[in-house]
Amino acid sequence: MRLKKLVLDVLFVGVVVLGLLVISQRAKAMYSERLNHNSLSQKAVIFKTKSHQSIQSTIQAIDQTKLNNFQVQFNVNNHLSYVYAKGKQANVPLKDGRFFSNYDFKSRIPVVVVGQSRVNELYQPTSQAYYQTKNRYLSVIGVVGTNQTTSLDQHVFISASPEFVLNNRSLNQVTVLVDDQQIGAHLKEYQKIFKTKSISNLTPKNTPIIGVNWLRENGTAAIILVLLIIVARGA
């Protein structure tokens, strides 16, 4: 009996350790996924619109509402986004400088935040670095990134405001993403502004609890551990 109890205790500890590993892996997977989605949360929604309304007109329409604590990204491509936000925003991992403030989203002068892999492309005659777009140089206020290698490293974010949008495009030329923790309550209002009912989740709802690579490396051990517990309890 003592041996059986000892075996069960050891196996129980193994299950606890395995559970902690699963939780840790899930947290790492979620964080990595967030970084690959321009640091937007799992609640972020993609609005697919064919509207010819300009980005600036759209921001002006949003500014007239009571919406707060949100971030909107107008993605030109996989490496460039115009950003407008109001109120509290999710934390972005910074290597240097700062992320956009509410003041930047009211200013007529756009500023830039770049991923750490884009730093070498910047023009830096003094301590201030600049991002060149066509014939214009924009002040860089921050560098984002972590020790992980993610798509965030390659991204360029340019602030936008009701007063000015650089290279103002129409909505059908960009991908519109909204990160709002109250998206369910505000969804219809956003749909009205973006002139569309077509939406999708940035993060698929069927995202696995743990990563595929983790299952490949540890799945067999987990199955064996469970089987041993079953055998020990039946002995």
Regions found by a protein language model. Give the residues of each.
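Short, charged/polar "capping" segments at the starts of alpha-helices
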Residues: Q53-S57, N120-L122, Q182-L187
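Mid-to-C-terminal secondary-structure elements
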Residues: Q116-F157, F164-N172, G184
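Hydrophobic alpha-helical transmembrane segments of multi-pass inner-membrane transport and secretion
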Residues: K4-K28, I210-A235
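A cross-kingdom feature of multi-pass membrane systems that activates on extracytoplasmic/periplasmic
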Residues: V176-R216
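Membrane-proximal extracellular/periplasmic loop immediately following the first transmembrane helix
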Residues: L21-P93
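Short amphipathic alpha-helices in soluble, non-transmembrane regions
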Residues: T58-I62, P125-Y130, H186-K195
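Structural motif
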Residues: K48-S51, G115-S117, D179
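Short beta-strand boundary microenvironments
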Residues: Q73-Y123
